[in-house]
Amino acid sequence: MVADSQPGHIDQIKQTNAGAVYRLIDQLGPVSRIDLSRLAQLAPASITKIVREMLEAHLVQELEIKEAGSRGRPAVGLMVETEAWHYLSIRISRGEIFLALRDLSSKLVVEECLALPLNEATPLLERIITHVDRFFTRHQQKLERLTSIAITLPGIIDTENGVVHRMPYYEDVKEMPLGDALERHTGVPVYIQHDISAWTMAEALFGASRGARDVIQVVIDHNVGAGVITDGHLLHAGSSSLVEIGHTQVDPYGKRCYCGNHGCLETIASVDSVLELTQLRLNQSMSSMLHGQPLTVDSLCQAAMQGDLLAKDIISGVGAHVGRILAIMVNLFNPQKILIGSPLSKAADILFPAIADSIRQQALPAYSRNTVVESTQFTNQGTMAGAALVKDAMYNGSLLIRLLQS
């Protein structure tokens, strides 16, 4: 996240405390100052100072709480104030860019999906900035105070410095300084994250893994990867938070991957590779119901659910390959649950048992026997994943402090 700074010790304490108080108000509001002091384990004087600054900045508001059966003056509670604060959430995928204006509660104000061609003479960075400018121009009457920009996209990304080293599909991308360029252009902090990691954060904050402390989330789409929540926090390794299972070699003699290696899991389990294998198998078998119709993920899943042997075998094979890599991760992280986000989840009754069986066969029984395989709540489209980046920046205080000081 390029927008994060390295504050001094005292400033870091202030940032952390403010973020903790904001999180409690956001999650529990309306909540009293007394309860905030107890829950945040901060002195009442500290709570008073932090809350006063948030009230003056119109980030929180006071609300009378009338408790049932109580007499006398109502208690005063605090709630976040979100409608006057907006951020831009951007999602870049293969051939498309999603742009959405959301308020700080993550409520959608307006969203667009536009074409972003894979091969064009104009560099991708320049095209992204142009789309942002035009989006703001089109929707300037709806825009309240802009706080930040959140960007999620596939590729090999240095999230700390906002640099995209490589991207699938967009071959001209090499060391693209996306975060820095957009921050200089707009004047607001920019948070950039791999789409799978951001999606993992969104599920933890708003979705299927909310409340779980240890989770592995696997995405099987045009790209394959995983995010890990351990002890309630997204796992970070250096400047990356993505577990690159998609670039784990499963076949040294396999197809060349965009990362430069051969036989990566992504070249076998991504939906493009799955459809390619299905077409190859169809050319050798005339008995499948997939003949005589367009071959898509939907038609493949539908055929599998209707008992087509070829379709079932293809999807089971994906589950076995993914499960083999997940077994290693289960041994490392001992998760409570594994979330699967994939268009192939339309055949979850086939895919998920194949993944679970592979894990049970190859992981430690003590770890694998209680692990649950479930579907994600959200999909890999749209801009909800970016909402998690902004929410996290408010909770850790990095964005909150900037808003208080502006």
Whereabouts are the PLM-identified features?
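Short, acidic, Ser/Thr-enriched surface-loop or helix-capping motifs
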Residues: D103, T159, I229
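General beta-strand structural signal in soluble alpha/beta enzymes
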Residues: E62-E64, V190-H194, V228
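Glycine-rich phosphate-binding loop of actin/hexokinase-like ATP-binding domains
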Residues: A212-A269
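ATP-binding/phosphotransfer module of carbohydrate and carboxylate kinases, centering on a glycine-rich
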Residues: M1-R145, L265-S406
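Short glycine-aspartate micro-motif
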Residues: G77, Y87-R91, L146-A150, V215-V219, ...
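Hydrophobic "anchor" residues
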Residues: L108, V164, L234-L235
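Glycine-rich phosphate-binding loop and adjoining helix at the ATP-binding site
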Residues: E111-D214, I350-R360
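Short helix-capping/turn signature of helix-turn-helix
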Residues: Q27-L28, Y170, F206, D221
